[in-house]
Amino acid sequence: MRLALVQTPCKLGDKLENMRRMERMLDQADADVYLFSELFLTGYMCRDRHPLLAEPVDGKSVTRVQGMAEQRDCSIVFGMPTASDVYTGVVHNSAVAVSPDGTIQRYDKLVPANFGPFEERLYFTHGLSPVLFTLAGMKVGVVICYDLFFPEFLREYAVQGADLLVCISASPATSREQFERIFPARAAENTCYMAYANQVGAQLNMVFFGGSQAYGPRGDLLARCKYYEEDIAVVEVYQREVALARRMRPTLRDTIACATPSEAGQEKS
């Protein structure tokens, strides 16, 4: 899989302009899968406008992205506020993946951030479970920003057979050091590729650092976009490298073994 990490500034609340920017970035690199940031469609700092900007996953914006994916024979993953198709008024902070055949996959952020400058729980309802995507023939586990700090979510994906872990994010400059400590650990402990696509630029009083990056299944840095600038980076993701890493350090095998009940050490009643 050729995976493109894309970071370009969003225009707050302007979905049409952000889709134009998406299309422009798609033409700057050749890839099988393009990864855009959290809430790319609207920008992150829309606050109480998110419920007004939210769309169902079969709405106009996703339909337009389907056309881009079909035309370029690629998959596109991006963040947007989605309106629940079950409960009126419920809005999720979602990652949406559109494949070239028109297939739509969706993951809703499990832990909306609600501390410091973040007030996501005022506007978004949390998701219910991890969702394993299939993209370009690979199994891909998706999380959104703060979800990354809950290693059990990513381990669940790895146990389910994920080759690649993806985090789309809107991480400000003050969070950079924490995020960059975690990426190689998540890759190495799960023996998966780890890819991160961040917002970049200023929105209201928040500055996003960019620095989208990817790691191999042993935790080695493969590529990193520029900090604080529009940029795109392309990495190659190989299933054989995942298989080799898991043979050399079988943490997933032993995780599954540890989770299996055993009579050893049990007291008899």
Explain the meaning of each model-derived region.
Residues 1-10, 106, 139-147, 166:
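Active-site-proximal beta-strand elements of phosphoester/diester hydrolases
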Residues 86-160, 172-181, 244-251:
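Active-site catalytic loop in hydrolytic enzyme cores
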Residues 8-9, 81-83, 109-110, 145, ...:
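Active-site beta-loop-alpha junctions enriched in small/polar residues
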Residues 57-77, 149-230:
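CN hydrolase (nitrilase-like) catalytic-core segments centered on the catalytic cysteine
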